[in-house]
Amino acid sequence: MIKVSQKCKTLEEGIKFMMAGAKADYVRMSTNNGLKELTGYSLEQTGKWDSNTRIINGKKYIKVVQENGVFCFIVKEDFKHFKKGDILKAAGYNAPALNSPRGNVLNGNYPIQWTGPLYLK
């Protein structure tokens, strides 16, 4: 787990920091917290990480796709009990889970793993 602490002014900047945190967590996991060298498949995956990340703008959400799976959804504008920038776990490929946000890319200070957003504690 990596804690993303940066506050951002734009959703695009926030998504960039979130995915950088996820990539850093992948490197941490692949190198056993830095105890071994990054090699083979893991080295290849980190090299392709940024090019494998796609941002898809929707009506209410920005969908962040890593390779072929949805990494998370980002709320574009305030609605219901969600704020602009809230990170939502994917319920499926086309919809987020609306139970609770996993953090906010604009406010920072949220945990992230290479597998996706974590619950706030």
Predicted feature residues:
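A cross-kingdom feature marking charged/low-complexity
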Residues: Q45, I112-K121
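A short, surface-exposed interaction/processing loop segment used at functional sites
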Residues: K83-I112
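An almost-null, non-specific background feature
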Residues: A20, A24-T31, L35, F73, ...
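Negatively charged, low-complexity tracts enriched in Asp/Glu with abundant Ser/Thr
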Residues: I2-I55
